[in-house]
Regions:
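Extracellular loop-to-transmembrane helix junctions
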Residues: 31-56, 82
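Central hydrophobic cores of alpha-helical transmembrane segments in multi-pass inner-membrane proteins
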Residues: 22, 46-58, 62, 68-69, ...
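The first (N-terminal) embedded transmembrane alpha-helix
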Residues: 7-26, 147-153, 225-232
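Hydrophobic core segments of alpha-helical transmembrane domains in multi-pass membrane transport
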Residues: 45-49, 89-95, 101-112, 147-160, ...
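Hydrophobic alpha-helical transmembrane segments of multi-pass small-molecule transporters/permeases
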Residues: 10-17, 42-47, 83-94, 153, ...
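Membrane-interface "cap" regions at the ends of multi-pass membrane proteins
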Residues: 1-25, 51-58, 62, 66-74, ...
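Inter-helical loop and helix-membrane interface segments of multi-pass membrane transporters/permeases
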Residues: 30-33, 68-81, 85, 100-164, ...
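Membrane-embedded translocation segments of transport machinery
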Residues: 2-9, 169-259
Length: 259
């Protein structure tokens, strides 16, 4: 792969690593629940904290050209604990996404009959996760989720077992599918009844909301999580970018545009 293609590929991988629930679900939730002007404190949080930390992580990975544990150990031996904490963060996050992936696997098999068409929420809690009534009934066990979760971890294992090379190949398949599905959801949502009213409610400005402390806390928290920081992801991508790769310009544009 040529230098220009490698540069583009690392850039796309960084975007793919950052795009997630923080961008698709949490940002619209905050914007709707607080104010349509939520993007103002969010952009400030990105400029003040998010983008500088993104550049720092990418630059560290590019300079040391090591995995995140060895990278911090190169600074100080006992700093390796920071790297291990980032690995642990990634494992916790991946454990969450593995469960979500398990739900998707279940719905792939049951989608042909549209068994949830009458009451989607009831079907999910009763048939899929088989939720209990409380902690007193904690002994309930969902066999479909358990089997799907094992399958999800097997998919993750085969996805990453050969390292970065395997991830690149899988990315070339999964990322276009993701973009296509997002476009489909966007077009479908605009075709729903009262879609424009929903867009207005989502973007409705409220100046008073900007003076609430909680909206600023949410903005800075979202700026950190939505860019995929503190998980060792950007350190790794930086180490794959090569010494001649310019960290600043491209990744600032990527960080701002994907949000």
């Amino acid at each position: 792969m040529g230098a220009n293609n490698s540069r583009l590929f690392v850039l796309l991988l960084s975007v793919a690593a950052a795009v997630g629930i923080g961008n698709i679900w949490i940002y619209p939730y905050y914007s709707f629940s607080h104010t349509g002007l939520f993007f103002i404190p969010y952009l400030i949080a990105l400029i003040v904290l998010g983008i500088p930390l993104l550049m720092l992580e990418l630059s560290m990975g590019q300079y040391f050209n090591k995995n995140v544990v060895d990278l911090f150990a190169s600074i100080r031996k006992w700093f390796s604990g920071i790297g291990w904490l980032m690995v642990f963060n990634s494992f916790i996050l991946m454990s969450f996404y593995a469960v979500v992936l398990a739900w998707h696997i279940i719905y792939i098999f049951v989608s042909f009959g549209l068994q949830w068409k009458n009451d989607a929420s009831k079907y999910f809690f009763t048939n899929v996760v088989q939720a209990s009534g409380g902690f007193n009934e904690f002994a309930n066990f969902s066999l479909p989720v358990f089997i799907a979760l094992i399958l999800a971890w097997l998919i993750i294992f085969f996805y990453i077992r050969k390292g970065f090379a395997a991830i690149k190949k899988a990315f070339l398949i999964t990322f276009p599918i993701f973009v296509f599905l997002m476009l489909m959801f966007f077009v479908y949502s605009l075709s729903l009844e009262n879609a424009l009213q929903g867009v207005y409610a989502f973007l409705k400005p409220g100046l008073r909301g900007l003076f609430k402390g909680e909206i600023w806390l949410a903005s800075f928290a979202l700026a950190l999580t939505s860019l995929g920081l503190s998980f060792g992801i950007m350190h790794t991508l930086g180490s794959k970018s090569g010494k001649g790769f310019l960290v600043g310009g491209d990744f600032i544009c990527a960080g701002e545009k994907l949000n």
